[in-house]
A protein has these predicted regions:
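Active-site-proximal or metal-binding-adjacent scaffold patches in catalytic folds
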Residues: 230
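C-terminal functional extensions of proteins
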Residues: 247-263
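A polyanion-binding, active-site-adjacent surface
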Residues: 26-184, 202-206, 213-219, 225, ...
């Protein structure tokens, strides 16, 4: 796999893309075993077609970070924070929605998220000095997913159609697995019954859908587990994100406080 931003130039034989290493937590095995043939075709379309038709095109994030978010166990998820697609500028996207690596300038969308957190929780004295959100995922259970996992440099939404079906299934998979866990726990003698009563839904997981693309995924989740807001991009943040209480709603649904600091 490539370890540079010039990732498409380092794939010597596109036919071998199905042999690249994808690291994910074991709790995602069922999903990836089901999807791997289709994922291989998606990656071939991205790297073969774009390299052939657009000689100098760059794809973000780097190929070894495309599935980075899935290194988190599904059992640890408290919040699915769903955005649109990766940052389409150089040295920004790192495989976690809205996040950037330390040393990278904080993008406007993430800056608005930080601004909103400071607005909602002034007593917590949050001080956001960088855009590395790894602690949110590792310690707070925030699953930082985009509806599209890749993007062409300078072209937002350029791969949204390619990833739509897969990320639909990701949302369904999370919801089904979390429901099934509680359902099976409460119905040990009837594990073959596929009918899940809504009263058994695990409400300790919240889907925060930011923007129109993310909100299209609402059909795969019970409404009691959903919070929606506009995307924090400067183009839409003032129309239903900034000045709201979206993160308070998340904590209220969870029944616990989230430490949104990044340290």
């Amino acid at each position: 796999m490539s370890n540079t931003n010039d990732n498409i130039d380092n794939i010597d034989n596109i036919d071998n893309i199905d042999k690249i290493d994808i690291y994910y937590d074991i709790t995602w095995s069922e999903l990836f075993e089901k999807w791997w043939p289709k994922l291989t075709e998606i990656l071939k379309k991205i790297y073969y077609n774009d390299r052939t038709n657009l000689k100098c095109v760059k794809i973000y994030p780097e190929i070894d970070n495309i599935f980075r978010v899935f290194r988190m166990s599904i059992d640890e998820i408290k919040i699915v924070l769903l955005g649109q697609d990766p940052y389409h500028g150089p040295k920004q996207a790192n495989g976690l929605a809205f996040a950037v690596n330390r040393g990278t300038q904080i993008p406007p969308s993430l800056r608005n998220i930080f601004k909103q957190l400071q607005f909602e929780f002034p007593d917590r004295n949050y001080n956001f000095t960088h855009g590395d959100l790894t602690r949110w995922q590792d310690e707070e259970g925030v699953f930082l997913l985009n509806t599209s996992l890749t993007v062409i440099e300078g072209k937002p939404n350029s791969h949204s159609i390619l990833w739509e079906e897969f990320t639909n299934d990701v949302i369904s998979y999370i919801y089904r697995k979390r429901i099934t866990y509680k359902y099976y726990k409460n119905n040990n003698n009837n594990k073959n019954n596929k009918n899940v009563d809504n009263k058994n839904v695990d409400n300790k997981i919240v889907f925060l859908l930011l923007g129109r693309n993310a909100q299209k995924k609402a059909e795969f989740v019970d409404m009691d587990n959903i919070i929606t807001a506009s995307h924090p991009s400067p183009l839409s943040a003032h129309n239903g994100f900034l000045g709201t209480n979206v993160f308070q709603q998340v904590e209220n649904k969870l029944g616990c406080q989230i430490n949104w600091s990044i340290v």
